[in-house]
């Protein structure tokens, strides 16, 4: 079963890692590849040992094993590249979704600010209209009071 790197390992940029950290990172990410390399190396060493001892049959057997193990290693490498390539694509897609979500939040915030601004302008307009109406009523009241005084004076006379 493959081991997926933790978020702290994934966050660390490969350019910032040392050689040994990169080796450990990639071995954890694709454990079948180093296992295939080790088994292929073992098959080559056994084939060389059998060639030196003159045992052609076993040497041929181990060379065949080497070819099979190399093929398995390449398949694991390609499968891992495909898997992590699609995972990287998904991560980019998630980043794009996060950008779109942030943009949508920004648009909603702008709309909310515009709505509040419009509401404030309407309140100011209503307040101004109320002041004008109050001023009109005050002037009308003053006019009526003046008329009432005139009527009272004319009545007294």
From Swiss-Prot:
Chain residue ranges for the region called Disordered: 120-157
Function: Cytochrome c oxidase subunit which plays a role in assembly of respiratory supercomplexes.
Entry GO CC: mitochondrial inner membrane; mitochondrion; respiratory chain complex
Biased composition (Low complexity): 136-145
Membrane topology summary: Multi-pass membrane protein
Quaternary assembly: Associates with the respiratory chain complex III/complex IV supercomplex.
Gene3D superfamilies noted in UniProt: 6.10.140.1320
Coiled-coil features, chain-numbered ranges: 87-157
Stated name of the protein: Respiratory supercomplex factor 1, mitochondrial
